[in-house]
UniProtKB/Swiss-Prot annotation:
Protein name: SPbeta prophage-derived uncharacterized protein YosC
Top-rank taxon, per record: Bacteria
Species this chain originates from: Bacillus subtilis (strain 168)
């Protein structure tokens, strides 16, 4: 699920969250690979992140809701119980929740509007990380500023042209610089 909390990518919003104490940084385990910024994979993911940020800004502007809305794709989105979004959209969501999440009814007056907004987000090939880093070889991923890192289980499975091995000490220096 993509929610505003999981989709805050621009530096100003990230800094605002850090000031409020909403986030603690964790590090990846070695070995580490960085996605090359000139690669098509990096560029498409960066564009997608910008589109998601733009979506949440437009959603907040249109509906006045900042927290509580999440989506998986343009056909499956909804709100979490106990949030501001839940109170606003409670007449337009299904009765049965899944882990506190209520999906929008397909016949809701908001469904088509929100669906169209989500469809503006650029689609990306979801298995690119497996192609570049090896099938089920990732241990985690992390954005630090404009840099995108992956931890992998074994270096032997990495075969992509869009990634470059990063020394763990250099990676930790980047993490420390970002924390300042």
């Amino acid at each position: 699920m993509i929610s505003r909390a999981s989709a805050v990518y621009d530096k100003l919003k990230q800094a605002e969250r850090n000031i409020r104490g909403d986030e603690s940084m964790q590090t990846l385990d070695a070995p580490i690979y960085e996605v090359k910024q000139e690669s098509d994979w990096y560029k498409s993911e960066k564009k997608r992140k910008e589109d998601i940020n733009s979506f949440f800004d437009k959603f907040e502007e249109k509906y006045g809701v900042k927290e509580g809305f999440s989506f998986y794709h343009s056909e499956y989105f909804g709100v979490y119980e106990g949030t501001e979004a839940y109170e606003i959209f409670k007449n337009d969501i299904v009765k049965n929740q899944v882990d506190g999440f209520y999906a929008f009814k397909k016949r809701s007056k908001y469904f088509k509007e929100i669906k169209a907004m989500i469809e503006q987000i650029e689609e990306v090939y979801p298995f690119r990380s497996h192609d570049e880093l090896g099938l089920n070889n990732m241990t985690g991923r992390q954005w630090i500023g404009d840099r995108w890192f992956f931890g992998v289980k074994t270096e032997q499975l990495v075969n992509g042209d869009s990634v470059v091995a990063t020394d763990y000490k250099d990676y930790l220096k980047i993490v420390m610089e970002h924390l300042d």
